[in-house]
From Swiss-Prot:
GO terms for biological process: regulation of DNA-templated transcription; regulation of flower development. Signal peptide: none annotated. It comes from Arabidopsis thaliana (Mouse-ear cress). GO terms for cellular component: nucleus. Belongs to the CONSTANS family. This is Zinc finger protein CONSTANS-LIKE 5. GO terms for molecular function: DNA-binding transcription factor activity; transcription cis-regulatory region binding; zinc ion binding. A zinc finger (B box-type) spans 22-60, 61-103. The keyword Transmembrane does not apply. Zn(2+) 2 binds at residues 61, 64, 84, 89. It is found in: Nucleus. InterPro entries: CCT_domain, CONSTANS-like, CONSTANS-like_Bbox1, Znf_B-box. Residues 285-327 form the CCT domain. Zn(2+) 1 binds at residues 22, 25, 45, 50.
Length: 355
């Protein structure tokens, strides 16, 4: 949506100068600029002067009202001069993307040009009783953003509407009456729409309930809803907890309340879950106690020597106050001789001991 003319004028403070007055009468604000005469004229003077001479003229800038207009901004619906166009459309990146076209010159009088503009605009044709042919400009399916098969056949028929002040009163939707059929799709289906008035404030698409398919045995069949916020619906079976979004794009309802017939009491679920966990933990404890008792029965308290060679070497090492001490050369000789004497005492005479 474009800026209004008053908001455009308030963007810069340099446009506070008075509007250019008419060069002919010097009393009325100029509205057009004649390029041949290089004169600014009001509508009355322009009609009087250019009734017979068809000079090329343009409108005066609608913002500063000091220079002839150079471009027309479609977003702002305003004719702007070169300086005002540069100032306004360089204010921000959004304004710089406005579509602008060179201003159109006219050769008729200003009153005739104003009458043509008012007749071509939507608001200008409401005051006169004229016949508008809606098929004068062909409406393509691509322009509506729709596929060709979505358009009814009667859209291609010529349609003429008598537009006037008498016909327009009380009928603000005369342009959109035919397009309501494009939005209201009704497909034949087996869905039964039931609106759930639960007192909610926000609006959401109406939830519908599908009819169950004929089955021979429903004992082990569960209808699961993947859109529910409660996880209890996956554990506890119910008759029908599935909900689907309405196929109509304009059908709305209120937010359903959580207190429905298909909901399960949370306290019951919590108590049953807690009781099962307590029973499992007690059984695990009893199993651990039994395993501990079996190990205690098979426990042996007898002393075993794993490395006999290490024990023998430790007994032969010298000790000082019960602790191991380092051996010296003299001690090694004494130990050797003591072993020799001990072995000779127990051996027979003349036999060389062996080690």
């Amino acid at each position: 949506m474009g800026f209004g003319l008053e908001s455009i004028k308030s963007i810069s403070g340099g446009w506070g100068a008075a509007a250019r007055s008419c060069d002919a009468c010097k009393s009325v604000t100029a509205a057009v600029f004649c390029r041949v005469d290089s004169a600014f004229l009001c509508i009355a003077c322009d009609t009087r002067i250019h009734s017979f001479t068809r000079h090329e003229r343009v409108w005066v800038c609608e913002v500063c009202e000091q220079a002839p207009a150079a471009v027309t901004c479609k977003a702002d619906a305003a004719a702007l001069c070169v300086s005002c166009d540069a100032d306004i459309h360089s204010a921000n990146p959004l304004a710089s993307r406005h579509e602008r076209v060179p201003v159109e010159t006219f050769f008729d009088s200003a009153e005739t040009a104003v009458a043509k503009i008012s007749a071509s605009s939507t608001f200008g044709i409401l005051g006169s009783s004229t016949t508008v042919d809606l098929t004068a400009v062909p409406v393509m399916a691509d322009d509506l953003g729709l596929c060709p098969w979505l358009l009814p056949n009667d859209f291609n028929e010529p349609a003429k509407i008598e537009i006037g002040t008498e016909n327009m009163k009380g009928s603000s939707d005369f342009m959109f009456s035919d397009f309501d059929r494009l939005i209201d799709f009704e497909f034949p289906n087996s869905f039964n729409h039931h609106q759930n008035n639960a007192g909610g404030d926000s609006l959401v698409p109406v939830q519908t309930k599908t009819e169950p398919l004929p089955l021979t045995n429903n004992d082990h069949c569960f209808d699961i809803d993947f859109c529910r916020s409660k996880l209890s619906a996956f554990t506890y079976p119910s008759q029908s907890v599935s909900h689907s979004v309405s196929t109509s794009s304009i059908e709305y309802g209120v937010v359903p309340d959580g207190n429905t017939n298909n909901s399960v009491n949370r306290s019951t679920i919590t108590s049953s879950t807690t009781g099962g966990d307590h029973q499992a933990s007690s059984m695990d404890r009893e199993a651990r106690v039994l395993r501990y008792r079996e190990k205690r029965k098979n426990r042996k308290f007898e002393k075993t020597i794993r490395y006999a060679s290490r024990k023998a070497y430790a007994e032969s090492r010298p000790r000082i106050k019960g602790r191991f001490a380092k051996r010296t050369e003299t001690e090694n000789d004494d130990i050797f001789l003591s072993h020799v004497y001990a072995s000779a005492a127990h051996a027979q005479y003349g036999v060389v001991p062996t080690f």
